[in-house]
A protein has these predicted regions:
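Phosphate-binding/catalytic loop of phosphoryl-transfer enzymes
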Residues: 1-44
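ATP-binding/phosphotransfer module of carbohydrate and carboxylate kinases, centering on a glycine-rich
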Residues: 31-171
Length: 171
């Protein structure tokens, strides 16, 4: 929000069209990395064993059906995000690269809003389940944001989402 009360938004238009940096995006990137590792197009990754265990399967073969053909693919895919962050915290380079790539894809949304609202030194509030649950991803996202908008300050929400919902309900 700028000094005139104008608000801006960029991104967040659903998992099919635009969900860069979300839990679903991380899960999709992780599944892609596992499939590429399995056929030799990508490097080996700790994600393979972690995702197979998480999904209770013995090989990569059922991943496309499990994550894309049952109508609940967005939820199932998003549920892989904690697997990615855990593997990154354990030093898996592929997982760390996924976090960095997702944050780099999300950060331009904040820049677009800052530019649209004419904010030179914006305060960016990073919210969402993934940001809240993973200090590592939050730090990577903060760094990506500061690379794009040097004078920005990045913080978490001041109030809970329930507080925000209550305020909206009062309007």
């Amino acid at each position: 929000r700028n000094q005139h009360g104008d608000e801006g938004r960029a991104g967040g238009h659903g998992s099919f069209l635009d969900d860069m940096g979300s839990a679903t995006d991380l899960g999709r990137r992780a599944a892609q990395a596992v499939l590429r590792a399995s056929d030799g197009r990508g490097p080996p990754t700790a994600l393979t064993a972690a995702i197979l265990a998480h999904l209770h399967v013995e090989s990569e073969a059922p991943l496309p059906a499990l994550l894309g053909a049952r109508g609940d693919e967005r939820t199932r895919t998003a549920q892989l995000a904690p697997v990615v962050t855990a593997a990154a915290e354990q030093g898996d380079q592929v997982s760390l690269d996924i976090l960095k790539d997702a944050a780099a894809a999300l950060a331009p949304s904040a820049l677009a809003v800052a530019n649209r609202l004419g904010l030179k030194k914006p305060t960016i509030v990073a919210v969402g389940g993934l940001v809240a649950s993973s200090p590592l991803y939050r730090d990577i996202l903060h760094a990506a944001l500061l690379r794009l908008i040097e004078d920005a300050s990045v913080q978490g929400p001041v109030h809970s989402s329930a507080y925000g919902a209550a305020l909206l309900a009062l309007r």
